[in-house]
């Protein structure tokens, strides 16, 4: 049987795990990567500008949760590896499974246009045009930095956390009064680093609301190593979780931080092993949300003002697909991507797959590895989704479950519970296999350009 040929955009962990799965199933593919090597967000100083790695970064997911199913992490790894170890793990994976020869580096997909009869016309940065039967989008969602637009002007230096590398680069923060805006993982890491007394003269953190901060260790073990079972009701998980956190670390106001306005699983929690210590030690000072910029300082929503030299905006990212010109395939003005079945398939577009487009707790690293099981089974005729009408109903139910519990915010549009998702995906694959068998196991995407050559 001739298989459809797939174009994969991106050679980060979502792209190369998808490639590995397609290779296992004998499905031809090409991967196009804008940078000169693999790794995406985890490639420090990535020349494509899409990495948010800073020099001191350690992943906040333990090695047990981020490991790929068929390629264990090294036994001598620490619980929370440095980004350089993770990148080496990615390189070892790609080389072990012979994927590098399928990746074209320094080549950006400039345009991906769906053809009326199906399939995709792919225009590359080299000017070359190729045709593919299917498209897998794995361009990541942590690269299009979002900076809020506040009134006023600021005379000092300001950067998004995406650009932060060290206390000296790209802005020298030594001896400066620094404001970090945000309370996400990057905000807490950067604030903790800069708040050390030999670095910033004074460190402020601005946040519109409080968040739940989870410890990295519980009982001497990584907190995510033994998660609650996926079947546990959400309300019970929240009740137990809040009780454990309060018993282990107390309340956020105990450290001079604002009390969270929402329950533990109603907002995106933050994992930090250092921020609470810095806050409790007086090394950083909390401020409410920013009201306006004011020359050499910032005015906050409570009317207070602080003189600052540097602002680090740790204010998140927008979801973007610059190669799509059709708005039906892009995120809307509220940062919501198109409705996707199992976060992968767009009803009515059977030859398009979104890979890794989620904010799964606790990990994104091996998320697309799970999704790729459905994609490979689908392209080889071993899986068939339900009719479009049912797909739409399931999409709504899934989104109500995964994002409905969170307060409305741009950062919460792609939230997801990893373990619950994987369990549901396993069941869906079994149902889809039965549907495919009843339909004669015919691949839903028929090969039109098996060589993926210019037409």
Language-model features, listed with the residues they occupy:
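Flavin (primarily FAD) cofactor-binding/catalytic cores of flavoenzymes
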Residues: 2-56, 72-211, 216-217, 231-388, ...
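A structural motif shared across PLP-dependent enzymes of the aminotransferase-like
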Residues: 55-63
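Short, basic/glycine-rich phosphate-binding loops at helix/coil junctions
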Residues: 64-72
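Conformationally flexible catalytic loops at phosphate/diphosphate-handling active centers
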Residues: 227
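Short, mixed-charge aromatic SLiMs
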Residues: 393-406
